[in-house]
Amino acid sequence: MSYLRNILLMGSALSLVACGADDVASPGDGVIVTPTPTPTPTPTPTPTPTPTPTPTDCPTGTTNGGIISGFRNCVLQGRISSNLLLRKIDGLVYSLSGRVDVGTDVGGAGTGGQSAVLTVEPGVTIFGSSGNDFLVVNRGSQLFAEGSATDPIIFTSRSNVEGTATDSSQGLWGGVVLLGRAPISDCNTNTTGGAVDCQNVVEGTTNALYGGATANDNSGTLRYVQIRYSGFAIAPGNELQGLTLGGVGSGTVLDHIQIHNSSDDGIEIFGGRPNLKYLVITGADDDGLDTDLGYKGFIQFVIAVQRDANNGDSMIEADSNGNENATPRQNTRLANFTFIQRSEVQGENTILLRGGTDYTMVNGIVIGTRNCLDIDGQGGSTTQPADPARDEAGPPVFHSIVMSCPTPFRDETDTPAAEIQTIFNSGTNNNANYTPTLTNVFINGANEAAVTAFDASTLGSFFQRTNYIGAVRDANDTWYAGWTCNASYVSFGSSSRNCTAL
């Protein structure tokens, strides 16, 4: 029995020795089964976006102009004699065929003609194909073009719709002309300036009249609007601007407006009483802001940037068409502006004040290529003392203005540089030789932030009080973003589209 037990134990030991370590299962193990790997899921294909269908017809009040670059083209032409609404319809754009009038001129007294209202919804695009295509809103009629911060209204050129416009394109269609019954100084008849029958023909047309005696006249609202690639010369000295305001009254609302690559001025104001706020003027080939014919008003928050050394003239031109003692006298008040002049081919001034104009500038930044400030005037008309009996406010006024140009003040016989310097230095916190520290072309840096601001609200209730100079306080101040368009020479951020695209 002991012998048999020993034999069995020896067999068991030999069996264990014959087994490799890999053949020994852990306690409780059975058959080892290697699981089949989970198959990689087939990715869901990204759906192809459904193209916006092109509308098959056009709204009432327009005619079908066919298809242009995948858009239905709905044409405005002739005279709009009754109220018209241009709706935002996906896949549809509107166009101007020739001069398009809103209403018929009602005259300075508002007793003639026929008024009409053109309303444009946010996101609408309206284009012109040539310099003969432009929009005129006549006295007594109104334009309500109210876009939004994320969906601006765009007035532009056919080439922009077709995708062929570039950052050097300009003068590809006429522009927008807004007329009213507010006072002007220069009449086309032997009439006293500012009278109800004092009227004139606006530049770029032969018979579009403006002027009257209604200071608070209301020509409508332009808000969150772009006007691209406009401007057209009918004849030398007779041009359409990006936006032309003739005799427009203070009841008109004008804010958040960009003028891009106008072949003439960005905005020209012929008399009247309009107030403007939040303006962006990019690439104007003449003056950025031109004011004439007894304009009285307030303008705040302006960014104006020229394209390059070969395009543009002054950032401001203010005068009165040679009639320097005509009344009402121009009295423009400008606050919180940043001007970037780059042109070296036209004019010699960044700011030109002449023709007996009265002008007040506060909280401004001026960067130029030649003379920062030129004040002209026959017989000292632009620098004469205040005289309420003659509607004269006195010499130009400057507070919290900083300038950086090769020459601060232009030296000429009518107003020598020393006299201009005395006027400039009579204000507070001015610096004619400051060093710019702007970022992204127009945003204040350390040197700009160090300047003590002037309380602009003391000049009029339209002005907001700010604690900074310039148009843009810092990188967190983004009033310009989203509703503007970008170019290679200036960017307003990723929320703004490129000007060359819709």
Language-model region placement:
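Bacterial N-terminal signal peptides that target proteins for export
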Residues: 1-8
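Bacterial signal peptide processing site
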Residues: 20-23
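C-terminal motif of bacterial Sec signal peptides marking the signal peptidase cleavage site
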Residues: 15-18
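Hydrophobic helical h-region of N-terminal Sec-dependent signal peptides
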Residues: 9-13
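Ser/Thr-rich, Proline-interspersed low-complexity disordered segments
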Residues: 34-56
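Extracellular beta-rich repeat passengers
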Residues: 26-32, 51-117, 129-140, 147, ...
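Glycine-rich loop(s) and the adjacent beta-strand/alpha-helix scaffold that form part
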Residues: 151-152
